[in-house]
Swiss-Prot record:
Substrate binds at K144, Y177. CDD domains: 5beta-POR_like_SDR_a. Its EC number is 1.3.1.122, 1.3.1.123. It comes from Antirrhinum majus. Keywords: NAD, NADP, Oxidoreductase. Iridoid synthase that catalyzes the first step in generation of the iridoid ring scaffold using the linear monoterpene (6E)-8-oxogeranial as substrate. Reduces 8-oxogeranial, generating an unstable product that is subsequently cyclized into several possible products, either non-enzymically or by dedicated cyclases. Iridoids comprise a large family of distinctive bicyclic monoterpenes that possess a wide range of pharmacological activities, including anticancer, anti-inflammatory, antifungal and antibacterial activities. This is (S)-8-oxocitronellyl enol synthase. SUPFAM superfamilies: NAD(P)-binding Rossmann-fold domains.
C-alpha cells in the first residue's frame, strides 16, 4: 500500500522530524516559493513529517511578508524576499546552493503576465546556475489554463468545456500560466537531467490566514460576520454556480501530489490536473458551512446576485470586534479574506477536471471534499484565526 494511499485513508503516523539541537542529515532540500500561501503552507507541513517520501527534507520557504508565527513550528528556513525584485532575489536565493527541489506556488495577485513571468524567472535564474544538486522543478498553475481570463472572452475565443483534460490546447489569449509553463520547459533544457512537473489544481481547500486564494477562510469570515450581526448566511451568487457540480483539492492532497511527481520516476516531466476525486455542489456545502457556525443558511432564491466584496466593504471594524471578542490572532479583514475570489467562484459555471491521467501514471490519492472543507475550518479554529 503506497504512502499516498495510506495518507488518504489516514493510516500514516505524521510524526514530525525532531531537530533537538542536532544537525540532521537531509536527503532532499526543498525551496518553497510562496510558503505562506494555502498551497505552500500545506507543502511545508507535509515535508515536516518523518515518513514523507524523499525525506528527511530540509525546507527553505520564500515569501514577501515577515515570517508568521504559525509557520515557525514547521522548521522552515524562512527567506523574506520580494521575488519581483531581481537583485534582491539573487542576493537571497542564489546562496542556497544545497537546493534539490523547487516548488513554485506563488503569484503576484494579478493577471500581469510580465510581472508573474519575471518572478518565476528570477527564482530559476538564481537557483539553476548555483545549485549543483538541483533535480526537479515543480510548478503550480491551475484551471485558468482551461478557462482563461473571462474578461477577455469573445465569440472567437471561448473557454474549453469541462471536463478538462491536460492535453487540451492553449486558449488564444494572454495567460501568465502559459508563460510560466514555458519557463519550466526551458529550465529542463538549461540543466541536463533536470526533471519537472506541472500541477493544475481545482479550488484549494486548506489552511492559510494570509492567502489570496483561500476560499475556506473567506467564507468562514463571511459566516462569522453574519453570526456576529445575527444575520443568516445568504448565498450571494448565481443559480448556475449554486446547482452545478464543482471539484476541489485538499491542500494536503495537493502537497502529496507535488511529492509524488517529484519523487516517482514515472510521473516526472508531465502536467497533471489534481482534485479530490469527487464532486460537490454549493447548495449542499452551504448547509455545512452554516452548521459549523450555527446560523441559518439561505440559498439561491431567484434574486439577482450581489457582490460579496460590496457587502463586506464596510465590515473592517466588525471583524476587529470579532477578533477582540473571541481573543483571536490579530488579523485585518482584507488579509484573511479574499471576497473577490468568492465572487468569481459564485459567478462561475462547473469546472470539472479529469483525473484519469493521474490514475494512468499511478497516483491514487484522494479526499472526501466535505470532510476536507470541515477539516480546513477546524484548523483555522485551532490556530485561533476564526471563532
Amino acid at each position: 500500500m503506497s504512502w499516498w494511499y495510506r495518507r488518504s485513508i489516514g493510516e500514516t503516523e505524521q510524526k514530525r522530524i525532531e531537530i533537538n539541537g542536532v544537525s540532521p542529515t537531509y536527503q532532499s532540500v526543498a525551496l518553497i516559493v510562496g510558503v505562506t500561501g494555502i498551497a505552500g503552507s500545506g507543502l511545508a507541513e507535509t515535508l515536516s513529517f518523518s515518513d514523507t517520501p524523499g525525506g528527511p527534507w530540509k525546507v527553505y520557504g520564500v515569501a514577501r511578508r515577515p515570517c508568521p508565527k504559525w509557520l515557525a513550528k514547521l522548521n522552515v528556513n524562512y527567506v523574506q524576499c520580494d521575488i519581483a525584485n531581481t537583485d534582491e532575489t539573487y542576493s537571497k536565493v542564489a546562496p542556497l546552493t544545497d537546493i534539490t527541489h523547487i516548488f513554485y506556488v506563488s503569484w503576484t495577485g494579478s493577471e500581469d503576465v510580465a510581472l508573474n513571468t519575471l518572478m518565476f524567472k528570477n527564482i530559476l535564474d538564481s537557483v539553476i546556475p548555483n545549485a549543483p544538486n538541483l533535480k526537479h522543478v515543480s510548478l503550480q498553475t491551475g484551471i485558468k489554463y482551461y478557462w482563461g481570463n473571462m474578461a477577455e472572452m469573445d465569440s472567437t475565443n471561448q473557454p474549453h468545456e469541462c471536463p478538462f483534460y491536460e492535453n487540451m490546447p492553449r486558449l488564444k489569449q494572454d495567460n501568465f500560466y502559459y508563460n510560466l509553463e514555458d519557463l519550466v520547459y526551458d529550465s529542463a533544457v538549461r540543466k541536463n537531467g533536470l526533471s519537472w512537473s506541472i500541477h493544475r489544481p481545482a479550488l484549494i481547500f486548506g489552511f492559510s490566514p494570509c492567502s489570496m486564494m483561500n476560499t475556506v477562510s473567506t467564507l468562514c469570515v463571511y459566516a462569522a460576520i453574519c453570526k456576529h450581526e445575527n444575520k443568516p448566511l445568504v448565498y450571494t451568487g448565481t443559480e448556475t454556480s449554486w446547482t452545478c457540480l464543482w471539484d476541489a483539492v485538499d491542500s494536503d492532497l495537493l502537497a502529496e501530489h507535488f511529492l509524488w511527481a517529484a519523487t516517482v520516476p514515472n510521473a516526472k516531466n508531465q502536467a497533471f490536473n489534481i482534485n479530490n476525486g469527487d464532486v460537490f455542489k454549493w447548495k449542499h456545502m452551504w448547509k455545512v458551512l452554516a452548521k459549523e457556525f450555527d446560523i441559518e443558511a439561505i440559498g439561491y432564491e431567484g434574486k439577482e446576485p450581489v457582490l460579496l466584496e460590496d457587502l463586506m466593504k464596510d465590515k473592517d471594524s466588525v471583524w476587529d470586534e470579532i477578533v477582540k471578542k473571541h481573543d483571536l490572532v490579530p488579523t485585518k479583514l482584507r488579509d484573511i479574506a479574499a471576497f473577490w475570489l468568492a465572487d468569481v467562484v459564485f459567478r462561475n459555471k462547473e469546472t470539472l477536471c479529469s483525473m484519469n491521467k493521474n490514475k494512468e501514471f499511478g497516483f491514487m490519492g484522494f479526499r472526501d471534499t466535505t470532510k476536507s472543507f470541515v477539516s480546513s475550518i477546524n484548523k483555522m479554529r485551532d490556530f485561533k484565526f476564526i471563532p
